[in-house]
From Swiss-Prot:
Its cofactor is Mg(2+). Mg(2+) binds at E431, D455. Belongs to the PEP-utilizing enzyme family. NCBIfam families: PTS_I_fam. It catalyses: L-histidyl-[protein] + phosphoenolpyruvate = N(pros)-phospho-L-histidyl-[protein] + pyruvate. Its EC number is 2.7.3.9. Coiled coil: none annotated. It is an enzyme of class 2 (transferase). The reaction takes place in three steps, mediated by a phosphocarrier histidine residue located on the surface of the central domain. The two first partial reactions are catalyzed at an active site located on the N-terminal domain, and the third partial reaction is catalyzed at an active site located on the C-terminal domain. For catalytic turnover, the central domain swivels from the concave surface of the N-terminal domain to that of the C-terminal domain. Phosphoenolpyruvate binds at R296, R332, N454, D455, R465. This is Phosphoenolpyruvate-protein phosphotransferase.
Amino acid sequence: MQELKGIGASAGIAIAKAYRLEEPDLTVEKKNISDSEAEVSRFDEAIARSKEELEKIKEHALKELGQDKADIFSAHLLVLSDPELLNPVKEKISTDSVNAEFALKETSSMFVTMFESMDNEYMKERAADIRDVTKRVTGHLLGVEIPNPSMISEEVIIVAEDLTPSDTAQLNREFVKGFTTDIGGRTSHSAIMARSLEIPAVVGTKAATGTIQNGVTVIVDGINGDVIIDPSAETVKEYEEKHNAYLAQKAEWAKLVNEPTVSKDGHHVELAANIGTPDDVKGVLENGGEAVGLYRTEFLYMGRDQLPTEDEQFDAYKTVLERMEGKSVVVRTLDIGGDKELPYLQLPKEMNPFLGYRAIRLCLEEQEIFRTQLRALLRASTYGNLKIMFPMIATVNEFKEAKAILLEEKEKLVKAGQAVSDDIEVGMMVEIPSTAVIADQFAKEVDFFSIGTNDLIQYTMAADRMNERVSYLYQPYNPAILRLITLVIEAAHKEGKWVGMCGEMAGDEIAIPILLGLGLDEFSMSATSILPARTQISKLSKQEAESFKEKILSMSTTEEVVAFVKETFK
């Protein structure tokens, strides 16, 4: 019996035989060719066949996983139509008289290396897209079949170096009980897909493929990030009991689907969900979400080759508002730049894009893009309970300017006879430390705050959470972070305004009792975290949590805070 430690990417426990998803031999040799025109035609044919396959995979992903996951394959299809990739391959075939496989390998390797060297998560994901697409096209050129996980017909746990988006989208939930990989993290494509499919997964083990043989029994514990190879009968029994306990826990959570979120001493807080597309609303309602606390509208702009029209945006916003049936929907205006780029929007190359031209800064300069989105939102406002918030606000003047543009567009629509809701709350994200420090000034201008802890933490601690060498400094429970959060909540409440939180911290079991004690009004998280959080809050006393507020805020280290919370609220 052996044990590997990785990252629990999708909760649950699975026990089954290992199925190694072997990488095909796609060794490419350089060959000189005499008929470059015929070779270019061979390349075009491989591209066409790859597009056909991806269209089918995209259709399957849309049906099984929803629009945002299908959009991954829209991005792949864009790569297969991108002249910046295809033209250099064809030029290399013609100029160097080399075979298509070699020309593709050389060109794609150059792009992958370039993208992976960027300090930008979005561009790193594009490198993964190019690798995935290149593998598929190369397979067609070599006549090598690419493994198809949808053909698996017995209960297995997949073992792979990594799973591409194409692999994961083709997993058959009936037979694939879980998977484990050598590489990857919680935010990798495969991890996100696993959570959508509710398949237990452990990624980043570093040694799964080097240790696990085909057919051996494997346990995947996606809750704790453990992989047990060839377990004893006693260990199998132990994990079967853990699996049953997890299912019982899920059943307990399910009882609270239609219940409000109320603490042990009767205090109500709102549990909301973060979404990226209209299809995500289904998960919000199935998990008992009381609101949408963050609608990330940038997904409307990604995976396509041009800006979405006003009508396309209107349809998306209207759909979300209608499906939420009067429950609050907080829409964040376009947050592009930093780790999210648009291929059709020529953003300047910056030394540090996270501190550069992004989000509201871009929108205030590219006003036609901003105004189009605001018009679509205003037109949709009569179909539900819409709230609008601006991201990455750094100064009071930025907020005032953004709100003034919103009011200008509202006035134009009303004059044109368009119905617009009269009670749209307008708020802002708190992601920049300077904003938290003068939250009392912002509180006079806004209707609400939403604290984006992911960025607030990394800006406050000067630590990129994606950089493994400094990730130890990404500390949600650091007293400095907790004091900033307190400044925001106290400033808002003094002005009679409410405060939400839409970063990962909002659904964290260590953070929840702290945030309850600090007075947070709305906790917005992934939909699958809502019921566990509701269960936890129902067992907490707000009065007790408040009584420890000063003690926690007077602590000096993260470790001290965590130890106290674990001991006090165990």
